[in-house]
């Protein structure tokens, strides 16, 4: 994997320094009863104190070492302090065993210079053992438009992929197309009826057909192509199905691209059902054959531990209980047909065979019961491949009723017939909010929390709308920097100024607070990636905007260009750094635009 520019993670930097101090103190016999092998096993913890009086960073690790060392935490902290090698960083022992760190100005200047030098690459970090990860998300049926829930998985999945990439992993994004089974036959039947209706026939849609008016649009396109001589009118259900499938998949791809969500692979479920020309077996049959050879399948009239029901027939069961599932699962019915699980097993076997270290699936809350069986599938084929299943809650849309003035849930769409589509959320004249607002609000909560999407707030052009507030902050940086260059003829530089006393020439607390916030980007990305929590970057962007606007309001620049050039330059660089970090967060991580003027 190609190397990428590396930013300094301040938390990793301090963690390594404390770990080294523990090793040195242990070798010197100064940590009481702590054995050398115990010393190397300690993983120091670095935190950001809620009160800046306690330093920029703090380490509570001595408190946890007290029992192992049989020493007072404060004594351990004092010992570690003596072995710390941190020039330009002030260290204090406080709180009965905390190590508090305050970053010195020369150290901060180096980090700011690194930020300005790396530019669009600032925030990217490396890890000793990067993983090759397959991230599967959205994976909708190609039988209708994508709904708002799919939009949430698209926003979360694409942002998580960015986070994993920026923190050093090799990530591939995959969409599993559910294009097999009875649903595809129903899609073809529904299109055929719509075509016949447009031709003047009085024919009704079957009750279980797809009733959305989007199929009328597809039927019109089909008849238009027939009239233009591009294709003949379909004569079989298979031909109707294939046309509808192609149209729906193209629409879904277009919608996802509009939401700035790209995929590296589109995996068709049909592949799993197609016989291999060499073996004559489908991927499903090959997967079950391998499970049989590994001793994970058996025939029975009921799963192990349960009594058969009257009249039950013999089916093939997968021993999912051996991998933590609550009961064994049927993979082949008595009539010889395969269950949905059989296809899922074959699909995950295919993933395992492609050589990934880790598989991540993002699923809706209605798939919670799939966790055990999918982990069993991966575990049966390879104990070394890690599978993570992230379960997300759904989205409800709310808008003010113009008649009552109360917030009401928006449930229906004229276009789809029974739900609000992702297209509606983006571009509908009545409820559409645009791509940036859609992504922002779909990313704004942790995955395990449902989202109550306020459509009114999302289109507000005031600072109540967090998208507008963050966009405005970036645009404000750009506008000020343009003015400085074009009107004041200021030449921007990456060289950070220090006074003769090797101090940053800052005068106000807002300056240092903003700088610390900006330098935290690598650690914010690492934490969000490790916790699979893209919403944390939303909170981080809001915090940057708040800190920057406090700085902007309290720290003048233009009057200082002649009065105090050194301070003016230092403040200009904070504006440069803010613009860069917001740009990286908005475009590189969250998939939003970064307007240069508003």
Swiss-Prot record:
What keywords appear on the UniProt entry? Answer: Aminoacyl-tRNA synthetase, ATP-binding, Cytoplasm, Ligase, Nucleotide-binding, Protein biosynthesis
Motif residue range(s): 'HIGH' region: 140-150
GO MF annotations, alphabetized: arginine-tRNA ligase activity; ATP binding
Q: Provide the reaction this enzyme catalyses.
A: tRNA(Arg) + L-arginine + ATP = L-arginyl-tRNA(Arg) + AMP + diphosphate
Q: Name one GO cellular component term.
A: cytoplasm
- Predominant subcellular localization, coarse grouping: cytoplasm
Q: Where in the cell is it found?
A: Cytoplasm
> Does the record bear ATP-binding in its keywords?
yes
Q: What is its EC number?
A: 6.1.1.19
Q: Does the keyword Cytoplasm apply?
A: yes
Which cysteine pairs are covalently linked by disulfides here? none
Q: Name one GO biological process term.
A: arginyl-tRNA aminoacylation
Q: CDD domains, from UniProt?
A: ArgRS_core (cd00671)
- Which enzyme class? ligase
**Which Pfam families has this protein been placed in?**
Arg_tRNA_synt_N, DALR_1, tRNA-synt_1d
Family recorded in the similarity comment: Belongs to the class-I aminoacyl-tRNA synthetase family.
Complex formation: Monomer.
Instruction: Provide the protein name.
Output: Arginine--tRNA ligase
Gene for this protein?
A: argS
């Amino acid at each position: 994997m190609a190397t990428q520019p590396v930013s300094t993670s301040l938390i990793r930097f301090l963690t390594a320094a404390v770990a080294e101090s523990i090793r040195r103190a242990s070798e010197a016999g100064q940590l009481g009863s702590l054995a050398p092998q115990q010393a190397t096993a300690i993983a120091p913890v670095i935190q950001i104190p809620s009160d800046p009086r306690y330093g920029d960073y703090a380490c509570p690790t001595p408190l946890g070492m007290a029992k192992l060392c049989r020493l007072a935490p404060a004594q351990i902290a004092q010992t570690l302090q003596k072995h710390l090698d941190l020039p330009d960083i002030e260290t204090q022992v406080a709180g009965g065993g905390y190590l508090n760190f305050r970053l010195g100005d020369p150290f901060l200047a180096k980090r700011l210079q690194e930020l300005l030098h790396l530019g669009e690459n600032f925030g990217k970090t490396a890890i000793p053992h990067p993983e090759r990860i397959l991230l599967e998300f959205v994976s909708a049926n190609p039988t209708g438009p994508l709904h708002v829930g799919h939009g949430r998985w698209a926003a979360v999945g694409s942002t998580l992929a960015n986070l994993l990439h920026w923190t050093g992993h090799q990530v591939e994004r995959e969409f599993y197309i559910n294009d097999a089974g009875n649903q595809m036959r129903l899609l073809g039947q529904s299109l055929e009826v719509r075509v016949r209706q447009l031709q003047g026939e009085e024919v009704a849609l079957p009750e279980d057909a797809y009733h959305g008016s989007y199929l009328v649009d597809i039927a019109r396109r089909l008849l238009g192509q027939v009239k233009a001589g591009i294709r003949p009118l379909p004569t079989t259900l298979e031909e109707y199905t294939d046309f509808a499938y192609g149209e729906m998949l193209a629409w879904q791809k277009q919608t996802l691209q509009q939401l700035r969500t790209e995929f590296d692979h589109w995996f068709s479920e049909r592949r799993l059902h197609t016989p291999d020309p060499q073996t004559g077996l489908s991927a499903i049959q090959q997967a079950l054959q391998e499970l049989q050879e590994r001793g994970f399948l058996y025939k029975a009239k009921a799963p192990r531990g349960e009594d058969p029901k009257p009249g039950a027939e013999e089916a093939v069961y997968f021993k999912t209980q051996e991998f933590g599932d609550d009961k064994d699962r049927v993979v082949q019915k008595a009539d010889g047909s395969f269950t949905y699980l059989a296809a899922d097993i074959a699909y995950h076997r295919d993933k395992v065979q492609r050589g990934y270290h880790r598989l991540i699936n993002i699923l809706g809350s209605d798939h919670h019961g799939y966790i055990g069986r999918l982990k069993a599938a991966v575990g049966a084929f390879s104990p070394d491949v890690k599978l993570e299943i992230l379960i997300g809650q759904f989205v409800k849309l709310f808008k003010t009723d113009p008649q009552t003035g109360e917030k009401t849930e928006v449930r229906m769409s004229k276009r789809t017939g029974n739900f609000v589509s992702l297209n509606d959320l983006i571009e509908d004249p009545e409820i559409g909010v645009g791509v940036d607002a859609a992504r922002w609000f779909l990313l704004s909560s942790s995955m395990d929390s449902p989202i109550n999407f306020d459509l009114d707030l999302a289109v507000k052009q005031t600072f109540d709308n967090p998208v507008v507030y963050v966009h405005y902050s970036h645009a404000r940086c750009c506008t000020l920097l343009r003015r400085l260059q074009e009107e004041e003829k200021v030449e921007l530089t990456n060289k950070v100024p220090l006074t003769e006393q090797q101090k940053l020439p800052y005068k106000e607390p807002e300056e240092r607070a903003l700088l610390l916030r900006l330098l935290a980007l690598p650690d914010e990305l690492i934490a969000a990636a490790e916790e699979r929590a893209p919403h944390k970057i939303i909170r981080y962007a809001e915090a940057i905007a708040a800190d920057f606007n406090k700085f902007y309001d309290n720290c003048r620049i233009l009057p200082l260009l002649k009065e105090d050039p050194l301070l003016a330059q230092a403040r200009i660089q904070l504006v440069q750094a803010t613009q860069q970090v917001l740009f990286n967060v908005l475009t590189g991580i969250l998939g939003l635009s970064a307007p240069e003027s508003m």
